[in-house]
Amino acid sequence: MTVCTGNICRSPMGEIILRHFFNERGLGDQVNVESSGVSDEEWSHPIDPRAVRVLRERGYGDEIPRDHFAHRISREEIDRTDLFLPMTASHMRALLRMLPSGKRAEVHMYRSFDPNLPKPKPGREDQIDLVDPWYGGKHEFEVAIDQIEEVAPYIVDWVAKQL
């Protein structure tokens, strides 16, 4: 479960890209990839058009769901999810407040899987935040998708070892 603020930019981009990488590895039928937000401020909105644009430009156009419905993570989603991938330290803190204690070990920041990034000190997880493209333009969305694509293979490798 990829998690961002409103479930219209980073988390749906992560969902689409991770699903693509799992399918490429032949694991698509064993892994269910979803996305959600920690806020309901964008409730019912589609994926941000700027995110859709960069996804199409990168070749994911056929994989963009037409029925995306931005939402805050639900109790049912929490119960059925084995891995939570918040995009930022702020998302991680908000998510941890929502989770029962038995689920907290299943929370790993998205970029924490990148072996090329230094492991942040406790309390400084924001050092590996995925860039927030919301207030930016095309460049910020390209940086965000670069960061998501860069880490996706490492997440897929890690999950494959857990299966």
Please give the residue ranges for each predicted region.
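Short polar/charged helix/loop
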Residues: 1-163
